[in-house]
Amino acid sequence: MAFQGTSRTLTQQSSAATSDELQKILFSPDAIKKMAAECDLGRHHWMRADNAISVRPLVPEVTHGRIASFFKSGYDAGELCSKGYMSVPQVLCAVTRTVSTDAEGSLRIYLADLGDKELSPIDKQCVTLHNHDLPALVSFQPTYDCPMETVGNRKRCFAVVVERHGYVGYTGTTASVCSNWQARFSSKNNNYTHIAAGKTLVLPFNRLAEQTKPSAVARLLKSQLNNIESSQYVLTDSKINQNARSESEELNVESPPVAIGSSSASRFESFRPQVVNGL
């Protein structure tokens, strides 16, 4: 009779608490800096013409070596059942454009295994985003845990790959990609349900929606008129001033910046949206 159970037990075992030594390797100040500098964890990566293909491993090389050494020593001593696995439940990428919507170009984003020379997308989890579709949120879910091994001269782990296509004539930054994930390490591994890569298009933020009232426009015009030197410009007819004000109230412009800490600043602060990773 075929086994009808699930692998939940393995999942519970693989999520067991790690040792203090491993915690120090992963969360020391030096390790955290390397995660940011080498892997761009939680940082904005700019896609430029001179960096058309970006491969960002989810574990820095030095940290990978220390983790692999920790598990290997425990395995050789008979204290651990394997040489270690890397588990990443989900990778979330926030993507925004930094050029006009008229620019013809796209980004191809996927999760790869550095143990694969071809760097093919894991389980075909790949997303293509056209420039005019941005901003967007993209998510990936690996279906297996990656062994902490060295293949040739490559330290095997998951990596986020971003390819830039098109954007003819644009040599500077055309898009910004901010990736977040939480890597876990254990001596036991598992396989997981296949889930297609997720893509959610996000509506651009309308920052003028709360600042189009006539009162805001009137304050802008008044502040501009008050800054004019009377010795250079003299308003000889008050009717002209009134007409200018009434016409300006129909305009759809943004109010001027407000000094931080003022009562007006706190009022305008409430108009700002809740944002995630710069979206």
UniProtKB/Swiss-Prot annotation:
GO terms for biological process: transport of virus in host, cell to cell. Keywords: Host cell junction, Transport, Viral movement protein. InterPro entries: MPV (IPR000603). One of its GO terms (cellular component) is host cell plasmodesma. Its main location: host cell. It is found in: Host cell junction, Host plasmodesma. Belongs to the cucumovirus movement protein family. Transports viral genome to neighboring plant cells directly through plasmosdesmata, without any budding. The movement protein allows efficient cell to cell propagation, by bypassing the host cell wall barrier. Acts by forming a tubular structure at the host plasmodesmata, enlarging it enough to allow free passage of virion capsids. This is Movement protein.
